[in-house]
Amino acid sequence: MAMKRKKISVIGAGFTGATTAFLLAQKELGDIVLVDIPQLENPTKGKALDMLESSPVLGFDANIVGTSDYADTADSDIVVITAGIARKPGMSRDDLVTTNQKIMKQVTKEVVKYSPNCYIIVLTNPVDAMTYTVFKESGFPKNRVIGQSGVLDTARFRTFVAQELNISVKDVTGFVLGGHGDDMVPLVRYSYAGGIPLEKLIPKDRLDAIVERTRKGGGEIVNLLGNGSAYYAPAASLAEMVEAIVKDQRRILPAIAYLEGEYGYEGIYLGVPTILGGNGIEKVIELELTEDEKAALAKSVESVKNVMRVLE
């Protein structure tokens, strides 16, 4: 039987979706289908063709097509959902909820119809609630519907730590728990630089400032751009998650997973450390938390639940 490349569909061909498609192709993780609404079909085809024409120069083998027809996504191994309206300055994440929930439901119906065995990674904000929507709408098992926020939030945290210490980001590890919003919980106790606990290297007031900047990281970029939101780091984070699944790497990565009692929460999608591999979310890793961390996580869960109430 002939070996086949993996097929990865990216729904939403805006800045994040297109950048994600380009990174996935460069990493040769599979053939890419970039999808957007019919009104944007030609620009989507144009972006895909432009990427494809870079392949001889960059030296990657991957087919990239643009389309508005979900039939072209048939039998995808992984589907990444970036579609939705973007957050504008002054707009709360909650303002996004109702519009993006409708979009998630429409997209999920089409995805499931054509790729009933795929893994779905959701980026659309507010991402905890949108991942839950896709999970419910798809009827897929929990390991196959995953939200992206922690890889990005942790990347921001690691960036700021590396800048503070003037060291390589490669030597900084960290974890961010909870919802993707102002109440996320960067776990400083479980964060290291070259194996040394950050608390031994950075004074508490500076660490607190880094934690606060991480929480506001998305908003900082929204305000600087003036129009639109971050897309390079979110796309890179999605690509890292796709790679972990496609290559069955069993990476320990923070991801938005469906909890069934872990950390004391049930029936909610929340950012937690996971093992991400060929079977999607293979395990949720439970860390021991201090009372302060538990309280911060509870506050984060409350924020997610408040957004979820808008869904109902």
UniProtKB/Swiss-Prot annotation:
One of its GO terms (molecular function) is L-lactate dehydrogenase activity. It comes from the Bacteria. NAD(+) binds at residues 12-17, 36, 100, 123-125. The modification Phosphoserine is found at residue 149. Pfam families: Ldh_1_C (PF02866), Ldh_1_N (PF00056). Substrate binds at residues 87, 93, 125, 156. The active site is at residue 180. Keywords: NAD, Oxidoreductase, Phosphoprotein, Tricarboxylic acid cycle. NCBIfam families: MalateDH_bact, PRK06223.1. Catalyzes the reversible oxidation of malate to oxaloacetate. Belongs to the LDH/MDH superfamily. MDH type 3 family. This is Malate dehydrogenase. It comes from Geobacillus thermodenitrificans (strain NG80-2). The gene is mdh.
